[in-house]
């Protein structure tokens, strides 16, 4: 998936799921399942319930996404 093909949205972590998956509520109210991007995993960035994150969604499946940034 090329970076320019993804849709980036802001969201909040609702709950933690197994295998570093998270349930994220987007600003528009939709709830998606997201996993951590490789660079965040490599740098051991921890994500907890309630964190504000940026999620990259693919136009092909808007129910799944990738967490690319955790706001401070």
Swiss-Prot record:
One of the essential components for the initiation of protein synthesis. Stabilizes the binding of IF-2 and IF-3 on the 30S subunit to which N-formylmethionyl-tRNA(fMet) subsequently binds. Helps modulate mRNA selection, yielding the 30S pre-initiation complex (PIC). Upon addition of the 50S ribosomal subunit IF-1, IF-2 and IF-3 are released leaving the mature 70S translation initiation complex. Pfam families: eIF-1a. InterPro entries: NA-bd_OB-fold (IPR012340), RNA-binding_domain_S1_IF1 (IPR006196), S1_domain (IPR003029), TIF_IF1 (IPR004368). Component of the 30S ribosomal translation pre-initiation complex which assembles on the 30S ribosome in the order IF-2 and IF-3, IF-1 and N-formylmethionyl-tRNA(fMet); mRNA recruitment can occur at any time during PIC assembly. One of its GO terms (cellular component) is cytosol. This is Translation initiation factor IF-1. Keywords: Cytoplasm, Initiation factor, Protein biosynthesis, RNA-binding, rRNA-binding. CDD domains: S1_IF1. The gene is infA. Residues 1-72 form the S1-like domain. GO terms for molecular function: ribosome binding; rRNA binding; translation initiation factor activity. It comes from the Bacteria. The keyword Cytoplasm applies. It is found in: Cytoplasm. Belongs to the IF-1 family. Its main location: cytoplasm.
């Amino acid at each position: 998936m090329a970076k320019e093909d993804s849709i980036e949205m802001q969201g909040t972590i609702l709950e933690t799921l197994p295998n570093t998956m998270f349930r994220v509520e987007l600003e528009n109210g939709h709830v998606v399942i997201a996993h951590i991007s490789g660079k965040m995993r490599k740098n051991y960035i921890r994500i907890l319930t309630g964190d504000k994150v940026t999620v990259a969604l693919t136009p092909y499946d808007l129910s799944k996404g990738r967490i690319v940034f955790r706001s401070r």
